[in-house]
Amino acid sequence: MLARAARGTGALLLRGSLLASGRAPRRASSGLPRNTVVLFVPQQEAWVVERMGRFHRILEPGLNILIPVLDRIRYVQSLKEIVINVPEQSAVTLDNVTLQIDGVLYLRIMDPYKASYGVEDPEYAVTQLAQTTMRSELGKLSLDKVFRERESLNASIVDAINQAADCWGIRCLRYEIKDIHVPPRVKESMQMQVEAERRKRATVLESEGTRESAINVAEGKKQAQILASEAEKAEQINQAAGEASAVLAKAKAKAEAIRILAAALTQHNGDAAASLTVAEQYVSAFSKLAKDSNTILLPSNPGDVTSMVAQAMGVYGALTKAPVPGTPDSLSSGSSRDVQGTDASLDEELDRVKMS
């Protein structure tokens, strides 16, 4: 068993060295197991047996018995997943940029018969197919898309390999691009492009920040003006309501005063009290005219207060003698002579005040 393992390891090392050199390997028959009649096939391996030079059967893992001399183990295929490094190669993109690119290929033998008789060396064939497919797919893409669409590029290479390798009994599980090397000048231009893009983004972000700041300031001023106008409106409404309440209160107070005055006039000596009030207001009016106005209205004898009071009493007496229009007394009298006499006396009294 140790001898068989050593022979298998030597065969794999030989195959790997041939793949790295880029030459198609030739299968060495010296590393194959010998027919010892009773054979034990390891797990995940398939041994292809030929009988008298023709394919006979495939030995499955476990105990197997062969006929000496007639049966011969011709191929040993591993059913495990195989990892192959695809050598670095040059490829030209759609925009005429030369790249150095390599990758890793993951495959598995699905049909040992096709892998043994369909191609001389399936692993080498798949490696060459991966290289040519990668060059073909890179020629369809620009340099920017090669970096942006690595996953789609890997999927395209896997699909192309599976279509061609189906007759070889091999299935490509996945393909991964390892490194992409660009020329120094292209790398410098890409770096400049990245820096320009960053400056552009910074400028755009700065302008957006300035715009948002201006919008926020304008919105704040707008809200401040709206609040100020609403406050002024509320103040005016409150002021108007206060003034209306004050006017109403004054009117009610004045009406109450008039009612009280009217009630007082109907009492005993009410006329005398009214005459005294009129005289006081008469004298106060002359005092205000003398203080607040440039036009001075003086009575005939300003030093005689008694005469001023007498004049005021005369005006009040003339007013009290005149009937009030619409009252029952004025309507029932029907005498125009009394009204004319009252008007005449009132006019005479006013003329006398003016003359004095």
UniProtKB/Swiss-Prot annotation:
Key words, A-Z: Acetylation, Cell membrane, Coiled coil, Cytoplasm, Cytoskeleton, Lipid-binding, Lipoprotein, Membrane, Mitochondrion, Mitochondrion inner membrane, Phosphoprotein, Transit peptide
Cellular location(s): Cell membrane; Mitochondrion; Mitochondrion inner membrane; Mitochondrion intermembrane space
Range of the transit peptide: 1-28
A GO molecular-function annotation: cardiolipin binding
Organism of provenance: Homo sapiens
Family of this protein: Belongs to the band 7/mec-2 family.
Function description: Mitochondrial protein that probably regulates the biogenesis and the activity of mitochondria. Stimulates cardiolipin biosynthesis, binds cardiolipin-enriched membranes where it recruits and stabilizes some proteins including prohibitin and may therefore act in the organization of functional microdomains in mitochondrial membranes. Through regulation of the mitochondrial function may play a role into several biological processes including cell migration, cell proliferation, T-cell activation, calcium homeostasis and cellular response to stress.
Residue list for modification N6-acetyllysine: K145, K233
Coiled coil residues, start to end: 215-252
Primary localization: membrane
N6-succinyllysine modifications at: K145
InterPro entries named in the record: Band7/mec-2_domain, Band_7, Band_7/SPFH_dom_sf, STML2-like_C, Stomatin_HflK_fam
Membrane topology designation: Peripheral membrane protein; Lipid-anchor
GO BP: any one term: protein complex oligomerization
Residues modified as Phosphothreonine: T327
Modified sites of kind Phosphotyrosine: Y124
Comp. bias (Polar residues): 329-343
One of the record's GO cellular component terms: actin cytoskeleton
Name of the protein described by the UniProt record: Stomatin-like protein 2, mitochondrial
